Amino acid sequence: DIDLMMPRADYEAFKRVFPQALGEKYVLQAPNTPGCEISNTFMKIILRGTERLELQKLNAPGAHGLWLDVFPIDNAPASAAARAVRGFFIDALNYLAVSNCLRTFDSAALREYVSVNPAAKRNYRLRMALGALTAFLPYRALYNLFDRAAQMKKNTGWITVPTGIRHYAGEAHRASAYFPPSEWKFEGEMVL
């Protein structure tokens, strides 16, 4: 599992060129992408002909191989208060969307896994309840809604990775911390 990040404009452009450029060797799974299966609130690139299962998605449709996770870098409000408010709603929508998906593809293996840890079991029960409350919507619709809601057109000089491990507000930084990219050497080649 390798994680990458892309500015939103590049992320959207990559989704458009992917089928022709890489579609024979890889499978693309991404929200708001016609013809794609969706497995997360972010993009996955899966190597065709490989098999690797995620415990939370044993029953999910689509490819289950070795993958790269690609997280969009989105603009964020300049105001800390606005980032906190926006972050709360974006994170809540993400939690609801993932809960809906977990309930949709629930499995005995996942239930057994969480049963040994009281905190994990409580979180699982909460996610199943929230998944039931949102069951009238397909998980794909919630993933697409989250992806659209996380995008912010206005460039404020602040960015975030809404699907990052520290969530929306925790991943917020001044854009100058990431951009412009710097060149470095990888396996003997200079890359950005």
Question: Which residue ranges define each predicted feature?
Answer:
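Catalytic metal-binding acidic patch
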Residues: 1-13, 188
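Alpha-helical protein-protein interaction elements
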Residues: 3, 86-90, 138, 176-178
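Conserved catalytic core of two-metal-ion nucleotidyltransferases
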Residues: 12, 18-78, 98-192
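A short secondary-structure junction signal
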Residues: 80-85
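A contiguous, mid-domain pocket- or channel-lining segment that forms the substrate-recognition surface
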Residues: 88-98
